[in-house]
Curated annotation (Swiss-Prot):
NAD(+) binds at residues 268-282. Its cofactor is FAD. One of its GO terms (molecular function) is flavin adenine dinucleotide binding. Keywords: Cytoplasm, FAD, Flavoprotein, NAD, tRNA processing. The keyword Cytoplasm applies. This is tRNA uridine 5-carboxymethylaminomethyl modification enzyme MnmG. Homodimer. Heterotetramer of two MnmE and two MnmG subunits. The keyword Cytoplasm applies. FAD binds at G9, A10, G11, H12, A13, G14, V120, T175, Q365. GO terms for cellular component: cytosol.
Amino acid sequence: MIYDSIVIGAGHAGIESALILAKKHNTLLITGSLKQVASLPCNPSIGGPAKGVVVREIDALGGIMAKATDLAQIQIKMLNSSKGPAVRALRAQIDKLEYPQIILEILQNTPNLTLLEGLVNNLIIQKNQVQGVCLIDGRKINAKTVIITTGTYLASQILIGDTKKASGPNGVPTTYGISTQLKEIGFEVIRLKTGTPPRVKKNSIDYSQTKIQMGDNLEQTFGFLTPQTTKRPQEPCFLTHTNQTTHQVIRKHLNQSAMYGGYVEGIGPRYCPSIEDKVVRFCDKNSHQIFIEPESLYLNEMYLQGLSTSMPQHVQHEILKTIPGLQNAKITKYAYAIEYDAFNPNQLKHSLETKKIQNLFLAGQMNGTSGYEEAACQGLMAGINASLKLQNKPPFVLKRNEAYIGVLIDDLITKGAKEPYRLLTSRAEFRLLLRHDNADLRLKDYGYQLGLIDKKDYNSFQNKKAKINLLLEKSKNYEILVNSDNLSYLKQQNSASLGEKTTLAQLIKRPELNFCTLQHFLQEKADKTIYEQVEIQIKYEGYIAKAQKEAQKLARLEQKKIPSKINYADIKNLSKEAKEKLDLIKPQTLGQATRILGVNQVDISILLVYLEKHHALL
């Protein structure tokens, strides 16, 4: 039997790929262990700055992460709620036992999708085109497309102190065949590192020495159509801090750390450093935050966010004894570092298909990213583009002004990765356009056009969009007269009086007024989220228009295509570094070329002149 597609790995990238492909194609999902499907080997949370927006983008395009998160969440918060809408994002603590179970049940009940427990040894490749896979037991399985989403399981090693063990997270076996084969073909393999903190028994913590961190009482969910009936009581988190005594212990044993003892080859994540890294790099700080987070409603176990380390086990005990609330904490699982093989993503097209091998796609942490959300959105896009390839249709590529997903993939392809890449709001030049609140308005039309959103969901979205447009129009035309009722209302809101009549749209631009003012005057039946959307579009109208204008400028550069057969060595006055980088990345547009490190504005001007002069010949 020949499958339309094989997905290797059932982590957060693999499940999104498989579910998208199974909507239209006969798909095989291969995993080393069905018990590890959608596992959460690091923090038991989904979302956060930029990442939370990505989860909503995944939902708008028909992915599963948002829905599963809503069902498994045990605490939810809106981050940066006091700041502007461009940086707001949801973050949820999720039950690490429930989440994988929810995903597994969905996979098992998905038509066109077969689950197989096994390990892939290598790929079947003929004439630079992937044809299927070979398992370590000798079985060969053919497929028209293959997506590799092996996460941190390629040639992975667990490190604690001076001990090394060949293993993936949670004791799942590592594999070497795929990375060895791709290296022999000519792929650039990079060695990366990440880590995880110790877990401790819930009932061994002295919570009186910590500060409780409750969730927010929100109506919002990650999924745009998640019913409110899924809500349940929230679990608290707790905050404590390291201190100078903690730091003395760490400095004393620094050479015993796997990282500082010289046992780690891989490069670690810049934005999620180990506790020993924090102590060394930020020596002026007297303390560092440690968040104590529940792992599950069904486990007597807490996760110590901020205490990632590769120190020996006895040192981990010593460190805990110095931290308020954790002096008598019993460790249930020791912290460790893990290093693994990944592939520099500049070897991929924007569709996430490899440049060297046709019909082979790579997605997730193996592309040099960190985080469940970054992995999931890559899996989604690889699944969509593998499906389009099977249908002989052009790839689906999101622009930087359309989605954080577009920012992430463009950064990976254009700049490559030498360290684990984390998505940040600061990476998006159009972040005011890429908000948490408008992910469906930006992307759901695409989801429907691609056949990923059903008619019922799309009709619900269309109704929402119509309601927003109606309220926007009414706000612009609704006159606020200077009368006693209106003046009294403004006084109650601590807002300045009116000297002359105005429109509701003009009034709502006052910083002290919000969507409640819209509800007060319009009296239209609509969800709070709809009123909030109208408020944002009115209040930030000028800034949004400016961002859209800048996006249009970028679009003009993106429309200037660079022919694939161009020879950069022939372009006089182009810097040597620019020639090397352009030849390596092979940008498809002038816009992409502007974002390549080592290519400056002078190089772009020279390239533009060359393209215009030699247009007919290329």
